[in-house]
Amino acid sequence: INGDPKKPADQPRNITIQNSFIGQGLQPHSCGGLIQTTINNGVTLYRNLYIDNKTRNPKVKGLNQFVNNVLYNWGNGGAYIMGDTEQKSDADIRNNYFIVGTTDNYDGKKLGATAPFTRYNEHFSAYLSGNFYDNKDGVLNGRELERADCMKKSVVAGEEIITSPTFLERPSDIHPEIKGLMTAQEAYEWIVDNGGASLPARDG
């Protein structure tokens, strides 16, 4: 999802993607999605399953609501990628479940998985709450992610530098209310039982 930066009046806006399976992007550039809007025009990603994509699960710039999604078996390219740009972004990231998989590449090599959140900086403002991370022990028993999981330390010229998004204490008012908000565990169970195309019960 992307607009022409030369046409400010012609930007993607008020888009919701929900109850979808977004997976197995074509190799060798296996991506879940690129979501780029302006700071005033948003995309909501709600109750989706991102599965078996090496990177961009998704990659986000602009205004984004990422709630009650399950991410499984992303690779070494990134799970939720936070812009990596000087463009201002504002995200509401709540109650998602990040589950590490086997991370096998199409050529049989092991990729390994990145941290759930990557490529952040101070230009990316985010409210993070209720997100869980689970390893690959075969049991869904993840731990809740903390702000420290979205911070990176480096040393530049002998000085320690901490890079992080700008953490918000609550979601910005510009984001719409999600009335069917679930916990990460409830979202996982709902997606397993109901996700994807559902005719005629839901999508008729």
What are these regions (language model features)?
Residues 57-59, 79-82:
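Short catalytic-loop micro-motif centered on adjacent basic/acidic residues
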Residues 1-56, 63-76, 90-102, 127-134:
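Right-handed parallel beta-helix
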Residues 94, 98-204:
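Long, contiguous C-terminal flanking segments immediately downstream of a protein's structured core
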Residues 51-53, 76-80, 109-116:
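Short, flexible active-site loops
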Residues 6-7, 54, 59-61, 88, ...:
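Context-gated lysine
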